[in-house]
């Protein structure tokens, strides 16, 4: 069931990219967010995410940190260093729970940090908040 506050928004013009190297995590995130009408894509790693972003810039990225090759921290660093992608909203979804990791994520430019296992209400609240900010910025 989608909370009332989430039902009040039309996110049909928004693009969301979920990035995780574990396919089941991508399936779960897609299922949790399936009632929203935004366009959702997935990537199975950092390089695939960067390639997808280069083709079509998303409004929001749901990003795992621990991935082989290019990890989530490096994805954030590259996105924030590029003026064309520096404004993309990023929500970290990770099993890394130390205060150091949380601080590092925010210091690198993440907009929110959600620890796994993901609680659906927490994810919905974050997605609604981030996409509402995107829509407000586009309206100005």
Enumerate the predicted regions with their spans.
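A Lys-centered signature of the CheY-like receiver
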Residues: 116-117
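Receiver (REC) domain active-site loop signature in two-component systems and cognate sites
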Residues: 67
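Non-catalytic signal-transmission and effector/linker regions of two-component phosphorelay proteins
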Residues: 1-15, 30, 121-140
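Short, glycine/charged-rich "phosphate-handling" switch motifs in NTP-dependent
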Residues: 111
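Acidic, metal-coordinating helix/loop segments flanking the phosphotransfer/catalytic sites
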Residues: 42-60
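Charged docking surfaces used in two-component/phosphorelay signaling
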Residues: 27-35
């Amino acid at each position: 069931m989608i909370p009332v506050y989430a039902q009040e928004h039309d996110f049909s013009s928004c693009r969301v990219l979920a990035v995780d190297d574990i396919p089941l995590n991508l399936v779960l995130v897609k299922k949790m967010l399936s009632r929203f009408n935004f366009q959702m894509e997935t990537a199975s790693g950092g390089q695939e995410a960067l390639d997808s972003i280069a083709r079509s810039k998303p409004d929001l990225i749901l990003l795992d940190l621990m991935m082989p090759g290019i990890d989530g921290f490096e994805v954030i660093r590259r996105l924030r260093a590029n003026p064309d992608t520096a404004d993309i909203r990023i929500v970290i979804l990770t099993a890394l729970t130390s205060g150091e990791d949380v601080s590092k994520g925010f210091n690198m430019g993440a907009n929110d940090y959600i620890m796994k296992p993901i609680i659906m209400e927490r994810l919905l609240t974050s997605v609604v908040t981030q996409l509402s900010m995107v829509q407000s910025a586009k309206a100005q």
